[in-house]
Amino acid sequence: HMMIYANRRHSYKDLPIRIGEIAHDFRYESSGTLKGIERGRHFCQNDAHLFVTPEQIEDEFSKVVDLIFSTYKDFGITDYRCVLSLRDPENKVKYHDDDEMWNTAEDALRKVLNDLGIEYTEEIGEAAFYGPKLDVNVKPAVGNEYTLSTCQLDFCLPAKFQLTYIDKDGEKKTPVVLHRAILGSLDRFMAYILEETKGNLPTWLAPVQVKVMPVKTDNEELMAYAHKVVDALDAKNVRVELDDRAEKLGYRMREGQVEKVPYLLVLGFNEVENNTVSYRLHGQALSLIHI
């Protein structure tokens, strides 16, 4: 992303510039730390870098924080801990050597969190080498706390890559970069969601939202009605599957429950006659609706 930014000239009027992607990352983690999709050597990350002027830091960081928590609201995540990771002033050899930069960066992040009324803890010595960061940590049902989301403030790398923009006075200035990962590693994020929901994903997130099950799969009338229902749902962008296997209905229903499909639709002759479907919401009894 640094090289993409450096590929052309930029004015202060262009900033902020936001460059993001879903990236495949590789990291040689020690074998003892590997843990399924929660921590692997290959993972996917929703990675973004935001190029801003110093005056835009607080506003852009505030937008990142809002995006993190609006995303958590969508997924029903309420149990998390915000950590402002700072450098250790007693061990400066670990960090980019610029006291003024560090003080400015840490004060900017701290001010935004205070202005937004967000509770957080400060952890000395946990910053990246190039700047302070906000980590949002969760505690899974099993195992240690880990970071889901992060936003890191970076004054260092833009200078090393010789990135510039032209300010309002026509002078070359170095932008500031915010490293942003809203969901962090997608693999780890899904591991957390699956663990928290025990696989009972909300309907909007379930890979298959509805399974349609005719009582008899060898009856033309029932199968025609089943295809009609599937087509109607598919037209509404519902992720629907037709289970037309030559198995007993009870067996297919049990499999649908084990797969944790949110809605199982059962179609019999009464449903065909009355233009209705019987449905079972995962974990509940059958109900009837008209279509």
Language-model features: where?
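NTP/phosphate- and nucleic-acid-binding module
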Residues: 1-288
